[in-house]
Amino acid sequence: MSRSCELTGKGVQSGNNVSHANNKTRRKFLPNLCDVTLISDALGQRYRLRVSAAALRSVEHRGGLDAFLLKANETELSMRARLLRRQIVKKTAVAA
C-alpha cells in the first residue's frame, strides 16, 4: 500500500531535521493518511479510500465525493478514483 493520497496525490516528502547547532539529518515527512468510507450520491454506493486529512476536508467543503471528483484534475487522482470519476460522469450524463 503506497503512502499517497488517492484523491490529491499528496505523498511522502523528504527533508532535514535541523538541530540548534545547525546539524542536518535526513528525514521523511509522511502525509496524514486516513482510511475512510465515502458515499457517492450519484452511484448510491460506498467506497473505501485512503485519503489525507486535507483531502477529506476538501471533499466536505466541496459538498461530497461526487462534487470533489467532478472538479478534480484527473492527473492527480489514483486509478481507482479515475474509474470512479468516469462512472459518476456517465451516470450524471444519463440522468441529465
Curated annotation (Swiss-Prot):
Cellular component terms per the entry's GO annotation: cytosolic large ribosomal subunit
Superkingdom field: Bacteria
Keyword annotations from UniProtKB, A to Z: Ribonucleoprotein, Ribosomal protein
Protein name: Large ribosomal subunit protein bL28
Regions of compositional bias (Polar residues) in chain numbering: 1-22
Species in which this protein is naturally found: Allorhizobium ampelinum (strain ATCC BAA-846 / DSM 112012 / S4) (Agrobacterium vitis (strain S4))
UniProt GO BP: translation
NCBIfam families: L28
UniProt GO molecular function: structural constituent of ribosome
Transmembrane segments: none
Family: Belongs to the bacterial ribosomal protein bL28 family.
Disordered: annotated span: 1-24
Gene3D superfamilies in the cross-refs: Ribosomal protein L28/L24
